[in-house]
Structure formats: structure tokens, C-alpha cells
């Protein structure tokens, strides 16, 4: 498992920073993680009281600022299409929305966006087969990837 490597541990630390930032804005909600020692269909659930409110996929980026994400990537978030499909299935089974969390560590910002609800994508998603990094630890793979426009995402700023 990637999570057992030094780079994997950095990913775990970044997800914890994501959780703390989210919960600082929404203290009534909890970010409940899936186990990190085995593959999971999604990264977390958003829970308030005894109710599940959303399925969450979280990605953390250390290689860019918010400005670079905007200027060079046009606010397009790349997520494997398999992960998107898995999260949509989980959201349907739980009858809750699927929300994307993109934490940009150098800028200490969390972009959040509802991606899917009630059997429908909430905005256009582009699917392309591209060569991307295979895992946290490197390597490359050719696979279907989704590009999600985050330009209308909520921006939660840390240390504000």
C-alpha cells in the first residue's frame, strides 16, 4: 500500500490538514475517514449528528499554489474516472451527494464542490484517456481521467 511509504504518510498528513480546515469552517460536521490501509471507494463521509450528508473524495496537492492551479491548469481538477464512478455509486447507495475536496497545501486553501447528486452530475465533466502518475509513489499509467472545473468551487482559506 502506498500509504505505508514516506510519500504515503505525507498524503495522510495532508488529508488531516484538509479535515482540520473543513471542520474549522463547519464545526457541526465531522469528516469521517475510510481506512487508509486498504483501497476504498471514497475517502470520507461528511456527518452531522447521526446523519450522513455526503461522500467525499479528497486530493491534496503540494506541487502548486492556487494561482498556479488557476493560471496553468485553468481550475481543472484531474481525478481518475474510476474514482468518480465509485464515488457516484456510493453516493447513490447512501442517497447523499458526492463532494470533491481539493486541498492546495502551499496556499493552505481547500476547494470544495458538489460533483454529483440524485443520479446527476452537477456540472460538465470532461473524460479523457491520458497518461498520468500511477500512484503517490510514482510510475505512469494510461487511463480514463475526469477533469472537473473547480472555478465555481467554495474556497476555504486556512489561517485567515
Which residues make up each language-model segment?
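Acidic-basic catalytic patches of nuclease active cores, encompassing PD-(D/E)XK
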Residues: 1-36
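Non-catalytic C-terminal interaction segments of nucleic acid-processing enzymes
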Residues: 2, 6, 20, 24, ...
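Conserved catalytic cores of phosphodiester-cleaving nucleases, focusing on short active-site segments
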Residues: 22, 44-67
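Active-site metal-binding core of divalent-cation-utilizing nuclease and nuclease-like domains
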Residues: 28-51
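Acidic carboxylate-rich catalytic motifs and surrounding loops in phosphoryl-/glycosyl-chemistry enzymes
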Residues: 33-39, 99-108
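Acidic, metal/cofactor-coordinating or nucleic-acid-engaging core segments within structured domains
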Residues: 81-101, 112-114
Amino acid at each position: 500500500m502506498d500509504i505505508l511509504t514516506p510519500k504515503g504518510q505525507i498524503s495522510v498528513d495532508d488529508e488531516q490538514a484538509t479535515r482540520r480546515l473543513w471542520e474549522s469552517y463547519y464545526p457541526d460536521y465531522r469528516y469521517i475517514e475510510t481506512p487508509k490501509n486498504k483501497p476504498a471507494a471514497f475517502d470520507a463521509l461528511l456527518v452531522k449528528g447521526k446523519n450522513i450528508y455526503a461522500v467525499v473524495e479528497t486530493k491534496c496537492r503540494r506541487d502548486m499554489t492556487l494561482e498556479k492551479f488557476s493560471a496553468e491548469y485553468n481550475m481543472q481538477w484531474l481525478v481518475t474516472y474510476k474514482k468518480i464512478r465509485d464515488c457516484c455509486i456510493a453516493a447513490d447507495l447512501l442517497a447523499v451527494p458526492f463532494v470533491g475536496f481539493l486541498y492546495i497545501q502551499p496556499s493552505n486553501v481547500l476547494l470544495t464542490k458538489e460533483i454529483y447528486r440524485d443520479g446527476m452530475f452537477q456540472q460538465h465533466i470532461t473524460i479523457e484517456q491520458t497518461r498520468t502518475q500511477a500512484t503517490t509513489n510514482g510510475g505512469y499509467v494510461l487511463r480514463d481521467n475526469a477533469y472537473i472545473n473547480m472555478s465555481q468551487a467554495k474556497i476555504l482559506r486556512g489561517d485567515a
